[in-house]
Amino acid sequence: MKPQTKLSENSSRCEKVLYSEVITQLIYFLTSKKITNLGKIRLVKSIRDSFLSQLENILCFFLVYRTTYSFGVCLMKRFLFNKFFNRHPFTRVKSCFSSSSPSKFSFTQWLVGFTDGDGCFSISKQKIKNGKNKWSLTFKLTQNLYNYRILYFIKRNLGIGSLYKESSTNTVIYRLRRREHLKKIIDIFDQFPLLTKKYWDYYLFKKAFLILEDANLNSFEKNSKLEEIRIEKKSLKQYSPVNLEKYLTKSWLIGFIEAEGSFYLLQKSPVRIIHGFEITQNYEQPLLAQISEFLFNSQISPKIKSKKNSLITNYSLSTSSKERMLFLSSYFENCFKGVKSLEFKIWSRSLRKNYNFEQLLRARDLIRKLKNKYSRGSQHPKDK
């Protein structure tokens, strides 16, 4: 009980500091003569949007974690104020979301990893009024509305593209369609190639882009070549031809796990809960094997289990070794950018603090409910 008392006391102190700093910063910014009226209006709108966004998040958090348990209270207070204080120099409380980047973090490699997990390259044809075909290329990343933060992080770093909401599916989509924007993203994927079978989607996507950009081809020739690409897409290979050992980096892996990884707690018996880590992919056995070696070395590599389901073969890289869990907890600290960061912090804290069974059960239920909010069709390991 002592650790809980300390957490509660710290929470009260943090709350007073946070509210005090909010008032101080607002008074300074709104009364400063250095800021124009337009600047003040923009600031107020920014604070309003930030407040409403965090209010929505905190309500979701209460629904997920209905308890006065001090760990939950502390997390909720940090969660509410993280966006505002990440922008100011007086921050004294760490955010539930990571605002820092690991040493030698590469955004471009991270983006390639995230795209390998959740990216989509599309080539579409549309009939227009004069009977001609209009071809369009689209690169997009889709996330649940609850995880819109990560798409904003991408848009802010790239400085291009647009975000829009799909109300019917409760998702947010980051989209690139303009040729000059696609050129920038193509340069990134040329420098750091995709490591999954999406390499071939990108290969045809770039091929189509070059055809559309070729001024020496007339409309008929372009249409003919693009139709050939659509036929070629049906016979794509299942693996990327890229040297995995050369291009698999920590930044790529952070992005890939952000999209495809799972940190979970699994109840093995009525009195025992274990921590686990898993990545599941279709066909990507060589990639999972390389991730295993990259993280854990070949001597302690977890087994990759193949599960045959219909015509698709699923491969799962999973481990629950306490030694490996502690390593992952340290290795990925403050690395993730979206809701995965909150999931990981809860998982990591429950691992390091040696929680009792009841506390682990609460942490497990919280992680599952968070996943149900931001994952499309997420699945959790069944209790044994």
UniProtKB/Swiss-Prot annotation:
Compartments it resides in: Mitochondrion
Keyword Nuclease (UniProt): yes
Pfam families: LAGLIDADG_1
InterPro entries listed in its UniProt record: Homing_endonucl, LAGLIDADG_dom, LAGLIDADG_Endonuclease
A GO CC term attached to the entry: mitochondrial chromosome
GO biological process annotation, one example: intron homing
Gene3D superfamilies: Homing endonucleases (3.10.28.10)
Keywords: Endonuclease, Hydrolase, Intron homing, Mitochondrion, Nuclease
Domain of life (superkingdom): Eukaryota
Any one GO molecular-function label of the UniProt entry: endonuclease activity
Enzyme Commission number(s) from the entry: 3.1.-.-
Top EC class of this enzyme: hydrolase
Family membership: Belongs to the LAGLIDADG endonuclease family.
Described purpose of this protein according to its UniProt entry: Probable mitochondrial DNA endonuclease involved in intron homing.
Name by which UniProt lists this protein: Probable intron-encoded endonuclease Cox1-I1b
Name of the coding gene: cox1-I1b
